[in-house]
């Protein structure tokens, strides 16, 4: 059921007329064998291939045609350079070329094989032949070895051994080639068990490089999990162990069913088609579907739709196909393991109950037809897996039965009452995600259970923010939530580990995570649509109204805490009150912060840092305090100012400071300054201001990380260009600003605080402190900072995205402030450009919250005009226009 889907590109029937294939090189005269003529004819052949592909000729036909063309070219050159007269030599295709698979930019790997070492004159002729091929711009990899050298080097190197196993004679001494074949398929050359084990380890290491999933948004068609290499691995093992040279021969040996062979052939054909198209788009060899190539490839494959729809359709097909390859690869390698290694051949299975048994640590069916007769037994198997920690996976023949039953389901599993009870029992059990939901996803049982899941399987998110498809991201959210029950997670997520045991029903959090992105790709607000699905699902599964509404609220508001913490002024009591009013209870707050942290971490490994952690902690505790105080009771801001001052004073008295001088400094500061700084920060500022020459600006760089970044404090005469000067200089030093608090005292002195990070997201390196401090001093001292923001080109990735600039003025009751939400394409020097616009318009900035989400920036600025009042409608219009004119990407960037 869950594997039935349409590959958009494969449904096309195109039959336009194409030109005839150019003549093969075997017909070339000796006078034709020089570079310009050969290059002209090779180019004609390559143009014919592109034309044929565009006209609907299959990739299989064209790949074989290219291999055949190169065979004829090499045979002709072998004769031209006189090797047909050299005894006991052969030209052998190895690797992908040995399999007869050449894409437009594929490497052409050849072996010049000889009985005895070639003499100098013969070696020189080989060099001339290879040089000619290079001059034709063919990517040729070659080796020149005697038979003995081949065997010795093959024994020492798995890659060389694998290439030799795939070898194919192009021309030359047949007996010599067969002699090599006899040796490499003997028991002394990489015995089958040793070769199998080495290839499994090699595949595991390769998968690790891609985080164990093909669902990265820029996958490698060849090497990602579920890609062509996973099919090659099956063929290599079968070739070495059985001598099978094709998937059909694997059926003859009883290790593939006809259906599995057809599925692998279909998968290989699809992956070949995408790879062939990619090679036509590129000029240099690569197999990665990078963002800037995806649209061109999708269009070449005739995917249709508006905007990024062709890419989304193509990538959805790709991800679904690689899922099938991965499942078959794992199942068949397990079957090979039993056949080749036979480690557990004599071990009797241990009964688990009347339906299942344990083979080693793998669960196995006792009745091979059980899943077809009783589909709910599929859920009974996963319930056993979550309850029994001895079970580490599913036995290969049971996977085969599961795949068969899955395809013959007449309705979703959730329509069966017993299956629903089992599903909820799984969710309520510790380890539900890793031991049940994850394997259910890997084997498409989640899709078979709940139809909504099928719509997000392979659903990509065309941005730089999300690293995975929607289904893979959701599974990672679930795994992250499960990790909060583990004490080992405490150092990285102390708050969530502390709160998790206090969640009355953790299964409701898992349900919310399962549905939080379920409506992505449907159009409309995915949070609202997903909440509707969640309520229906919860009620269908017997949850009461309170439980159903909690799950729906978490789905509807799963972005609320992240948006509030990162894009709102959480030191504003009104923001905390508004957020608290939505949350309503401490219990809902605990659920929400757990879902929020898991969602951020599972979106992109590089997204979570101590800066985001500090913001969420601050919002959590401020909201908790507000909820305990009661929604009707606003915080006493005067009391908080007094409290901060007294605590800072107590710290300063330990240094025997001049209190009279301190009070002169503090008397010039406004209440906001004391509200928005901790007592430690107030004491740090005062300590240095008391010792500082008041005729010069002061720049302080904190030695301790603040909110995961480095705090920079600036005291200087205020002027409109000050912010632009500071952020411009920080940008020139490759520092990113994440937060800015801007204060102007009653005497016109600015007291500004910036939180900055290095490009890798870490606090400012200690050895850079004096350099940055000195650079900022110089920038501030210039009477009118005119250093233009750096103009740098957008990276190729960023250039591929379109984020129109939006200037949204948020509603507020504050008549003295304007809240500007700026959304724009992330680009070098953005904040410096924005600061210059503020300065040009004579605006004063009071705070800034900087948020980068993939290719987008979503920043919050609190502004006032020169009279310290909110911006007029006319000023807001001018500001919005200036921002759009300056920040919308163009060719100059």
Swiss-Prot record:
InterPro entries membership: ACT-like_dom_sf, ACT_dom, HD/PDEase_dom, HD_domain, NT_sf, PII_UdlTrfase/GS_AdlTrfase, Polymerase_NTP_transf_dom, UTase/UR
Biological processes, Gene Ontology terms: regulation of nitrogen utilization
Domain HD: 470-592
Name the record gives this protein: Bifunctional uridylyltransferase/uridylyl-removing enzyme
UniProt source species: Yersinia pestis
Sequence segments annotated as region (Uridylyl-removing): 352-710
Cofactor needs: Mg(2+)
EC number: 2.7.7.59, 3.1.4.-
Domain ACT: 711-793, 819-893
Molecular functions (GO terms): [protein-PII] uridylyltransferase activity; phosphoric diester hydrolase activity
Highest taxon, organism lineage: Bacteria
Regulation: Uridylyltransferase (UTase) activity is inhibited by glutamine, while glutamine activates uridylyl-removing (UR) activity.
